[in-house]
Amino acid sequence: MSEKATEIANLLSPTVESLGLELLGVEYLPAPGGATLRLYIDVPLAEQPERVINVDDCERVSREVSAQLDVEDPISGNYTLEVSSPGVDRPLFTLEQFARHTGESAKIVLKLAQDGRRRFQGQILRIDAEAAAVVFAVDGKDVQIGYDNIDKARIVPDWVALGLAPQKPNKPGPKKPGHEKKKPSNESAAGKPRAE
């Protein structure tokens, strides 16, 4: 998260927790016409998977946070507040969140290039807490990426495991009588030979 997003997350986290929810992270996206402040919320880990985030949860957080932002005023200028569940392609904001998703695949965008690349996709292998880094399996190699160099990260859903993978098309079966393809004929519709 950016410094501004971290500042806002620290400010709003107690409010979200007071509603029995968890603030996973904040995206602050400044733009000329007005910024977007996006909050990702979830139910506490202990309550998953029995309980999931719903629209009512997002509305409650939006109301409470909106009131707090009006008083605290951490953002100058106009902005749009969005409150969202993380979805199946959830963003990852903290080392703890990377640890929760060990074994899953993630897409990562770096702040500074590493090995000539800024974008990686690989399986989260482990967290190196001492080095404050995440170790990924990328293209058959272990790649250690410093947490401070990660700009954005998202889980890549396993659509097959979720039962949402597109089905392969059925192989064509035998043709029904009367539905065979007609061979091009040298005759016109009237049965007369065509002039060539």
UniProtKB/Swiss-Prot annotation:
Q: Does the keyword Cytoplasm apply?
A: yes
User: What is the protein named?
Assistant: Ribosome maturation factor RimP
Q: Name one GO cellular component term.
A: cytosol
Q: Where in the cell is it found?
A: Cytoplasm
Q: Which organism is it from?
A: Xanthomonas axonopodis pv. citri (strain 306)
Q: Which GO terms describe its biological process?
A: ribosomal small subunit assembly; translation
Free-text function comment from the UniProt entry: Required for maturation of 30S ribosomal subunits.
* Ranges of compositional bias, category Basic residues: 173-182
Q: Which residues form a coiled coil?
A: none
Which keywords are on file for this protein? Cytoplasm, Ribosome biogenesis
| Annotated region (Disordered), positions in chain | 164-196
**Which family is annotated?**
Belongs to the RimP family.
**Gene for this chain:** rimP
